């Protein structure tokens, strides 16, 4: 898909938003993926509950902030669910609410860091990614990158809604205290140092239409073409983690 690239002026004009107002992006989640894992503090039971509560709160707010909702890029599980961001938006946000928009799926994401004054997520990687770019990120506490000093974290539904209602006030108080250098370090550790391209694995979406025969053909092909040295490297690094009782797998090629 070819994405439309817009300059700031054109973007705000296209979405009929006031460019003088603060702009906050809210990143929705894949509504089926990771609902039950990776959270030591459970604020919402699932991503759909969080999305609905967020939209309901936005519906009650004034128009002093531009709120732009971004759908998750993954198609995982969409064939198995009856709702999505667009449907929830249509059901909850009134047509008179001119400052709450959905980011068009044919627009390039390159514009986001150029115009975002803040971003919000429940527990997605966007909170880490945009923190690396020195954009204040509101996330729930108790997720895999929280507690490091580079995000603004909410520990309850009440605190989350307070942040939504008082976004500019909270930003003025907390923005300059955020440590984006820690975000960059955490991103490298998680997506560089602890990642390894296993020669026998490939990206597979269980909601795709690949049948069993196609799946097995892909596996057999990977076995046939496998780089044995790469496999032995993975085996060595994994043994090092297990024997050392280490929490994390380390790809020593990237040290």
What label would you give each PLM region?
Residues 22-25, 64-68, 101, 117-120, ...:
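Beta-sheet entry/capping signal
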Residues 104-152:
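A donor-sugar binding/catalytic signature common to diverse glycosyltransferases
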């Amino acid at each position: 898909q070819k994405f439309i690239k817009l300059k700031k002026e054109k973007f705000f004009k296209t979405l009929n938003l006031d460019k003088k107002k603060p702009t906050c992006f809210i990143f929705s989640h894949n509504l089926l993926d990771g609902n039950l894992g990776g959270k030591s503090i459970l604020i919402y039971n699932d991503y759909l509950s969080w999305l609905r509560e967020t939209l309901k709160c936005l519906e009650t707010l004034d128009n002093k902030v531009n709120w732009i909702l971004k759908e998750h890029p993954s198609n995982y599980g969409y064939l198995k669910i009856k709702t999505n961001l667009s449907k929830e938006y249509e059901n909850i946000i009134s047509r008179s609410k001119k400052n709450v928009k959905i980011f068009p799926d044919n627009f390039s994401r390159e514009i986001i860091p150029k115009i975002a004054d803040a971003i919000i997520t429940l527990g997605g990687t966007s909170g880490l990614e945009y923190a690396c770019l020195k954009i204040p990120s509101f996330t729930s506490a108790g997720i895999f990158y929280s507690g490091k000093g580079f995000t603004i974290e909410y520990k309850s539904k009440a605190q989350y809604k307070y942040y939504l209602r008082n976004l500019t006030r909270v930003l003025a108080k907390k923005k300059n205290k955020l440590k984006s250098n820690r975000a960059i370090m955490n991103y490298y550790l998680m997506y560089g140092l602890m990642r390894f391209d296993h020669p026998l694995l490939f990206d597979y979406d269980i909601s795709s239409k690949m049948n069993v025969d196609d799946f097995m053909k892909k596996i057999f092909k990977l076995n046939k073409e496998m780089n044995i040295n790469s496999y032995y490297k993975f085996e060595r690094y994994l043994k090092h983690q297990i024997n050392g009782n280490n929490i994390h797998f380390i790809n020593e090629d990237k040290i």
